[in-house]
Design a protein with these regions (language model features):
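GHKL/Bergerat-fold ATPase module in large chromosome/replication-associated machines
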Residues: 118, 136-158, 178-182, 188-621
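GHKL (Bergerat-fold) ATPase N-terminal catalytic module, capturing the glycine-rich phosphate-binding loop
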Residues: 1-179, 183-184, 192, 425
Length: 621
């Protein structure tokens, strides 16, 4: 087959342009990414050798080999892993089908240091090699194939694929280094970078180099060159080591390599269990959220091993989805090596490991919560996701409630339910909360006024998930939850019922409101829980389901709501005497617009509102 030329997809071209011209900070991470990719290829081959009958007889010692030529300014990374065929090369190294390129580009901030730190997290690590290389040659052969292929590119919009000769399965990547980056073709530089980032890659990494010695003295001195191949990493699964052997630095360096994250984790949990079940877990709580945390197709951050043999890294059942930000490893001694991913979903051993792991992780989060400043670093990126557990994890619901934090009417900072309950007033029977789309609008809600008169605090819930999970939370520490906008809550305030004579007096005015707003509202009611506000938009029918649909990205048709009026307000008292129908209509619409502003913070038809306001002002002046 002759050389076939292909064009990179548009997003790949943008990415390569950034790699070549912009992201100069921390260039050395390219080697971390290529070694990590090689390790993944070895993991995948190990898994296939356990599950594919045709490959069970393969006798392979998995390893990664690095070599360099300082004269030619080349660096080569070679593995004997799963390898790639022609389609794999096109898909993985030419399109965005299997990478996070689009997400990476949208996440760029313009800060070179921060942006270079994103490379590994978005699955675009291979392209980081173009930061140091002006040409890359990939030679690869898939373990299930017969033909080897070469992929060549200078990163300038195109790449070529051709057939080549390669006996062993696996991938060999040769970088032709730029002049200014030729120092990476040196023994000490490679050794230093590997020890920094890839010390605990669970496969041996060998470095081939030429060792020069001098024998004799004076004119008789001879230069003797000897080619050597040394293992330069520990190749130890860090999670299998004794905690007493490890330092904080070891855990953090392993995290940075494992999670492709240059930042330090907030915390880690290393646990070894022996008894009826034997397994080891090492979990990390990151300091920042994964880029895909709120995507349906998020990638699990946990890898499953059986007796140190990699099984899968895309099983979302290893931990519940509300802990999807957690990174780490589960290594079981009891699962069969040839376990399939389908069997994993019903496996009792894994279910027990999962249950115990969740408790360990929640306990660690509880430890973080004891330091308010430190907990804020956790809660800001992960608090919304943690709330999701209230819907599905009934076993740990009480623990989750302890860990959640909320804004409230009386506090500027986030408060726990324990803190809220400690400040309950003497006659207060419930924990009150108010749902809305915006914290500032919730703080301005007229509904809060009657609660304020009683001295009752109200939790203000503005996260999208709140409307879905909170109605399913009945109580905390034997104290019931109540939606502050519901009639049961308002009854607890001891408000007097609106008398029939008041209803009779407002009957005609309410009818005028209904006639003017018939296309906008479901109906009009007099309210006894408003103080300074004239009007308020009531609850949306099926609010919980509507909010859930919005959260899932589905369009929700606008539903009509009830308009609540304050019969004690001076404006309504004056409107009772208004006989000018045109002027009354303008006032009614202005009051409705005001209520909509309190609810949404904006109006759909600002032009009409402005015209009505000008008309009323003109008549008043």
């Amino acid at each position: 087959m002759s050389n076939q030329e292909y064009t990179f997809q548009t997003e790949i071209n943008q990415l390569l342009d950034l790699m070549i011209h912009s992201l100069y900070s921390n260039k050395e991470i390219f080697l971390r990414e290529l070694v990590s990719n090689a390790s993944d290829a070895l993991d995948k081959l190990n898994y296939l050798m356990l599950t594919d009958e045709k490959l069970k007889g393969l006798n392979i010692t998995p390893s990664i080999h690095l070599s360099f030529d300082s004269q030619k300014k080349t660096l080569t990374i070679k593995d004997n892993g799963i390898g790639m065929d022609k389609n794999d090369l096109i898909e993985h190294l030419g399109t965005i089908a299997k990478s996070g390129t689009k997400s990476f580009l949208s996440a760029l901030s313009g800060d070179k240091k921060k942006d270079s730190a994103l490379i590994g997290q978005f699955g675009v690590g291979f392209y980081s090699a173009f930061m140091v290389a002006n040409k890359i040659v990939v030679q690869t052969k898939k373990v299930t194939g017969h033909q080897a292929y070469a992929w060549v590119s200078d990163g300038r919009g195109k790449f070529e694929i051709s057939e080549c000769v390669k006996e062993e399965q696996g991938t060999e990547i040769t970088l032709f280094l730029k002049d200014e980056d030729s120092h990476f073709a040196s023994r000490w530089e490679i050794d230093s970078v590997v020890k920094k980032y890839s010390e605990h890659i669970p496969f041996p990494i060998f470095l081939t180099y030429t060792d020069t010695k001098f024998e004799g003295e004076g004119d008789n001195q001879k230069e003797i060159k000897e080619e050597k191949c040394d293992q330069i990493n520990q190749a130890s699964a860090l999670w299998k080591m004794n905690k007493s052997e490890l330092k904080d630095k070891d855990y953090k360096e392993f995290y940075q390599s494992f999670a492709h994250d240059n930042s330090e984790p907030l915390s880690y949990i290393h646990n070894k269990v022996e008894g009826s079940l034997e397994y080891t877990t090492l979990f990390y709580i990151p300091s920042k959220a994964p880029f895909d945390m709120f995507r349906v197709d998020y990638k699990s951050g946990v890898k499953l091993y059986v007796k140190r043999v990699f099984i899968t890294d895309d099983d979302k059942e290893l931990l519940p989805s509300y802990l999807r930000f957690v990174k780490g490893v589960i290594d079981s001694e009891d699962l069969p090596l040839n376990v399939s991913r389908e069997i994993l979903q019903q496996n009792k051993i894994l279910a027990n490991i999962r249950s115990a792991s969740v408790k360990k992780i929640l306990s660690e989060i509880e430890c973080l919560s004891k330091d308010e400043k430190n907990y804020h670093k956790f809660y800001e990126p992960f608090g919304k996701v943690l709330k999701e557990g209230l819907y599905g994890d009934f076993e740990n619901k009480e623990k989750l409630l302890e860990l959640l934090r909320f804004y409230s009417k009386d506090k500027e900072k986030l408060v726990s339910l324990k803190e809220y309950k400690e400040n309950l007033k003497e006659n207060q029977k419930s924990i009150y909360y108010l749902l809305g789309e915006n914290l500032d609008l919730l703080k301005a809600s007229p509904l809060l006024e009657k609660y304020a008169q009683k001295g009752y605090d109200v939790l203000l819930l503005s996260d999208e998930i709140d409307a879905f999970v909170m109605p399913g939370v009945n109580e905390y520490d034997k104290t019931p939850f109540r939606d502050a906008s519901h009639s049961e809550s308002l009854k607890e305030l001891g408000l007097e019922e609106i008398h029939d004579e008041v209803k009779d007096r407002f009957k005609d005015l309410m009818k005028a409101f209904e006639e003017n707003l018939k296309d906008e509202i479901k109906g009009v009611e007099l309210s006894n829980h408003l103080t300074s506000a004239v009007a308020l938009i009531g609850d949306e029918p099926n609010a919980m389901m509507a909010n859930f649909m919005r959260q899932m990205g589905q369009s929700v048709p606008e539903s009509k709501k009830t308009l609540e009026l304050n019969p004690n307000h001076a404006i309504l008292q004056k409107l009772l005497k208004c006989e000018d129908k045109e002027q009354l209509s303008a006032f009614i619409w202005l009051l409705y617009d005001g209520a909509k502003l309190l609810e949404k913070g904006a109006l759909k038809d600002a032009k009409s509102f402005n015209e009505r306001l000008n008309s009323v002002l003109l008549k008043a002046l």
